[in-house]
Amino acid sequence: MVKIGVLGLQGAVREHVKSVEASGAEAVVVKRIEQLEEIDGLILPGGESTTMRRLIDKYDFMEPLRTFAKSGKPMFGTCAGMILLAKTLIGYDEAHIGAMDITVERNAFGRQKDSFEAALSIKGVGEDFVGVFIRAPYVVDVADDVEVLSTHGDRMVAVRQGPFLAASFHPELTDDHRVTAYFVEMVKEAKMKKVV
């Protein structure tokens, strides 16, 4: 069984743990740097990206997270997690982890009162997935090797680049675990490659 960490500094941690377990993997809430060595993949949950960055800095997580990204182990960022993974953020000089060759606009769908749900078609996952968007970012631009998995209107809301997966929405806030299951499969495949 693969072991998937959920960065436990802030955000929808419990919901991700439940979704990982429902997808047949072991979930670990990561609160200490050394726990990164024990896991096969990592979820960066949605929350408030500025607060999350402050906590990442406070607990000296940034370099270990960048090292984890370079190790080739899969990472999945939802909402604020997508912002953490992006190489370029509109209106900001520096990236956070910067592992994905994508450009992201924060709060692109508006403030909290503009939160909404939308039925999405997600490549590799299926149709009619209910995307919960809460002050969501979206992907403005991608490198050639980034696969766009889903759009809402003309906006890219789910993308994959090798071992990295990012979504504007909160898949953990529904009882539909297909997006998490897709990430669990990515982690299993990556672990199999390491074994071979």
From Swiss-Prot:
GO terms for biological process: glutamine catabolic process; pyridoxal phosphate biosynthetic process; pyridoxine metabolic process. PROSITE patterns: PDXT_SNO_1, PDXT_SNO_2. Its EC number is 4.3.3.6, 3.5.1.2. InterPro entries: Class_I_gatase-like, PdxT/SNO, PdxT/SNO_CS. It catalyses: aldehydo-D-ribose 5-phosphate + D-glyceraldehyde 3-phosphate + L-glutamine = pyridoxal 5'-phosphate + L-glutamate + phosphate + 3 H2O + H(+); L-glutamine + H2O = L-glutamate + NH4(+). It comes from the Bacteria. The keyword Transcription regulation does not apply. Pathway: Cofactor biosynthesis; pyridoxal 5'-phosphate biosynthesis. The keyword Transferase does not apply. GO terms for molecular function: glutaminase activity; pyridoxal 5'-phosphate synthase (glutamine hydrolysing) activity. Belongs to the glutaminase PdxT/SNO family. Catalyzes the hydrolysis of glutamine to glutamate and ammonia as part of the biosynthesis of pyridoxal 5'-phosphate. The resulting ammonia molecule is channeled to the active site of PdxS. This is Pyridoxal 5'-phosphate synthase subunit PdxT. It comes from Bacillus thuringiensis (strain Al Hakam). The lineage of its organism: Bacteria, Bacillati, Bacillota, Bacilli, Bacillales. The gene is pdxT.
